[in-house]
């Protein structure tokens, strides 16, 4: 086929390599034309020009040019602050038939900084209109990322942002429900730390919703073994602090003693700071004393009795 090359775009149906048409020069020219049209207050004409080019790049398997066209289309809408056009362009380009993975990912990653402040906060806004647009953009990007493995990280971030927005509006139940939609433990592209942090947020909001049955289920997704690893101390403390809330509701003194002892025994962040380890050890002793007699309670009692820090605790009156 004249004017075509076999590129790195992968195999098409039937195992044949897709043919790639190099549209880089045409893309350079038409992007420049589109920018000039926008400078002349002709956004619709610029988007129409780029839409036709987007199809040629997509059908011609020129992914590099396709990504540039998609990014430019969104950027031009943002440049003139046409929020309606931006949302529509985003939706249209992301849902094109046989749209390339690279294009969808580029669209989402281009738009996210306009509604997200790293790492998981909604974009700071000064007007209600800006706030409403950011909320719409977060929802649109979440919808686009739904079910796409290559956008797992982005979907997790967007979900955290949406939950934060709802929590700030005072709707804890809705915030908890939003986070529960994402089974982050199955996301292969997220690090262990990212997964644990997300699950801890699920726990916090579920407890805030006072759904203790769900909170227990979510807590079961956290590997205690992972919490013992290096650089996980912060998450270990957060986890067992949340568990104290759960076990207080459950009125389980022995589990509370174990929770506080897990906090107390965290190296670095707790054991090196008397202001932190002393309250944790004191709570351990109190709840252990309130625990019903049993083998586990007695074993833990003997272990605590041999701790030299016990002598540093103030007497309880």
Question: For each of these PLM feature ranges, what is it?
Answer:
Residues 1-317:
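Extended alpha-helical scaffold regions
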């Amino acid at each position: 086929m004249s004017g075509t090359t076999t590129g790195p775009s992968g195999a098409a149906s039937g195992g044949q390599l897709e043919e790639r048409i190099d549209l880089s020069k045409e893309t350079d020219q038409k992007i420049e034309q589109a920018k000039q049209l926008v400078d002349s207050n002709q956004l619709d004409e610029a988007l129409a020009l780029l839409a036709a080019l987007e199809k040629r790049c997509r059908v011609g398997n020129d992914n590099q040019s396709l990504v540039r066209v998609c990014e430019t289309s969104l950027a031009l809408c943002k440049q003139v602050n046409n929020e309606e056009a931006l949302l529509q362009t985003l939706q249209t380009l992301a849902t094109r038939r046989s749209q390339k993975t690279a294009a969808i990912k580029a669209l989402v990653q281009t738009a996210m900084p306009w509604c997200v402040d790293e790492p998981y906060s909604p974009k700071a806004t000064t007007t209600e209109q800006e706030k409403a647009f950011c909320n719409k953009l977060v929802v649109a990007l979440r919808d686009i990322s739904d079910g796409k493995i290559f956008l797992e990280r982005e979907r997790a971030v967007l979900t955290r942002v949406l939950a934060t927005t709802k929590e700030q509006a005072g709707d804890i139940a809705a915030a908890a429900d939003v986070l529960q939609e994402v089974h982050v433990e199955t996301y292969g592209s997220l690090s262990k730390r990212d997964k644990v942090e997300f699950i801890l947020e699920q726990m916090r909001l579920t407890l805030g919703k006072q759904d203790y049955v769900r909170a227990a289920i979510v807590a079961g997704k956290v590997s205690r073994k992972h919490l013992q690893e290096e650089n996980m101390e912060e998450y270990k403390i957060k986890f067992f602090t949340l568990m104290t809330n759960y076990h207080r509701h459950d009125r389980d003194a022995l589990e509370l003693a174990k929770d506080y002892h897990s906090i107390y025994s965290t190296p670095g962040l707790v054991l090196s700071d008397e202001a932190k380890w002393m309250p944790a050890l004191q709570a351990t002793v109190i709840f252990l004393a309130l625990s019903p007699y049993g083998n586990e309670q007695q074993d833990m009692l003997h272990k605590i009795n041999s701790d030299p820090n016990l002598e540093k605790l103030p007497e309880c009156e």
